[in-house]
């Protein structure tokens, strides 16, 4: 896709939160590889683990299909999210993060991402297929806040 997609123009303030996402190098590599394989479409995954006062720890990645087959958006199936949530609870875990890619733009949340962060109030890891960068964000009090990935 050529040019700049205005859906990804950052139009809101980003501040950094003290809480972190713990994601292994192996898991980072798996997510990046998956995002690259799904190009030119956005990819997405559900990350399962545990939350404490200090961090969210990712223990399992559930790669999911982007049924929208779009270069600028993805669809979260409520049934898939429910299924993953139920399986996580059976293992004393929970959904801790949503992952998705921006194949041809920066690893920053779009206005569309911000809208859906309200519906899925988890941290969101965004991978840039353009810069190969991975950043994490959460929506708190209508402000997008950046979270460290460690």
Report residues per predicted region.
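Conserved beta-strand-loop surface patch within small alpha/beta domains used
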Residues: 2-95, 104-150
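Short, well-ordered beta-to-alpha junction loops that form the rim of enzyme active sites
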Residues: 101
């Amino acid at each position: 896709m050529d040019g700049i997609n205005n859906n990804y123009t950052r139009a809101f303030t980003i501040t950094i939160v003290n809480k972190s996402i713990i994601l292994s190098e192996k898991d980072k590599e798996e997510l990046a590889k998956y995002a690259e394989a799904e190009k030119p479409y956005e990819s997405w995954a559900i990350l399962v683990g545990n939350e404490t006062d200090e961090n969210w720890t990712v223990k399992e990645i559930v790669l999911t299909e982007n049924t929208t087959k779009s270069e600028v958006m993805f669809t979260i199936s409520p049934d898939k999210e429910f299924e993953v949530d139920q399986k996580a609870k059976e293992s004393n875990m929970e959904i801790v993060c949503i992952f998705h890619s921006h194949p041809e733009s920066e690893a920053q949340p779009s206005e569309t991402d911000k809208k859906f962060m309200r519906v899925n109030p988890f941290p969101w890891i965004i991978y840039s297929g353009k810069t190969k960068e991975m950043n994490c964000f959460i929506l708190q009090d209508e402000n997008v806040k950046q979270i460290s990935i460690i």
